[in-house]
Amino acid sequence: MKKRLDIAMVERGLAASRTQAQALVMEGKVRVAGQTEYKPSRQIDDAASVEVEAPPRFVSRGGEKLEGAFDRWGPALSAEGKTCLDVGSSTGGFTDCLLQHGAARVMAVDVGTNQLAYSLRVDPRLWVRENFNARFMKPSDLPETPSLAVTDVSFISLKLILPPIRDVLADGGEIVALIKPQFEVGKGNAPGGLVRDERLRIEARDGIVRFAEEELGLALLGLAESPIKGREMGNVEYLSYWRK
């Protein structure tokens, strides 16, 4: 019997989710019968050997992006013992990173459903709310008040997500937000989803910084290019670190 490679990887415990499996395959880290395979949809036999070069640290590559923030701004930036909020949790890369950094509680919210890796979903430190539009999030929507919030969202501007995050965050709380220029410059400036013009990328980044400072009263603690580019098109993205 044959089945898709990404499905087989999850069933064999080689990946925590199909999203993670697909990323590993497309990055050339998976071998089938000794040969590197680049198509997650490839049909393989049940008896076919599948090897992953190096087990990933997080359930998705998003975790490596947030890890870049901890590497750059820690120990001032810390999740240890904190109640945290992950807006746009998706597969759970940021959530996984927070838990591995000692978060006492992570509240994961996402507009989608059934995306979060099972290994995270069963963690007792996790509270999950799916089918939830964070644009309209209020303090009463959460079981606790977070002191650290992180966000990696797509197909929406941070100008619509940062205000509700600020409103639910504890006074003095911190935010790590991934600025994705491809969703800030307008479709006409990102043909095929890729922002090729560095000037537009910088303008998008700086526009979010001005908005957060001037409209939301947030204090910028750090700004740096993400160590990992956007998955689909290789877009340059930016990590931003804030205090309320």
Residue ranges and their predicted role:
Residues 159-174:
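A short glycine-rich, Lys/Arg-flanked "PGG" loop and its adjoining helix->strand segment in the class I
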Residues 172-185:
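Conserved beta-strand signature within the Rossmann-like core of class I S-adenosyl-L-methionine
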Residues 79-90:
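Conserved class I S-adenosyl-L-methionine
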Residues 99-105:
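Conserved S-adenosyl-L-methionine
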Residues 90-95, 112:
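Residues at the N-terminus of the alpha-helix immediately C-terminal to the conserved SAM/SAH-binding loop
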Residues 1-48:
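A basic, amphipathic helix-loop patch mediating RNA/tRNA/ribosome contacts
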Residues 107-156, 160:
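S-adenosyl-L-methionine
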